[in-house]
């Protein structure tokens, strides 16, 4: 029987995106995907409300394509979104 699973378009590279009082109520991931025309795979997300302010973080897996990964990190920098590479 033929394998019918979709091809894996994601690399092993993952980043942690931090959501603070400036970004928690914005559609950061959808804006990123639309602006960069590159998919991300959400691995984990957690948000909490502290003193009426939402904070959180999300781990996303990046595409295999190096140009797309560079576009994503450039967009995050340009939009002052805090992120770090996950090991």
Where are these regions (language model features)?
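P-loop NTP-binding/switch modules centered on Walker-like glycine-rich loops
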Residues: 1
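Non-catalytic connector elements of ABC transporters
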Residues: 4-87
């Amino acid at each position: 029987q033929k394998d019918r699973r979709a091809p894996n378009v994601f690399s092993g590279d993952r980043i942690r995106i931090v959501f603070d009082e400036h970004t928690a109520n914005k559609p950061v991931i959808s804006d990123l995907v639309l602006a960069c025309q590159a998919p991300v795979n959400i691995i984990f997300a957690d948000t909490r409300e502290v003193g009426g302010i939402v904070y959180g973080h999300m781990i996303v897996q990046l595409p295999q394509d190096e140009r797309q990964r560079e576009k994503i990190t450039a967009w995050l920098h340009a939009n002052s979104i805090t992120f770090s590479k996950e090991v």
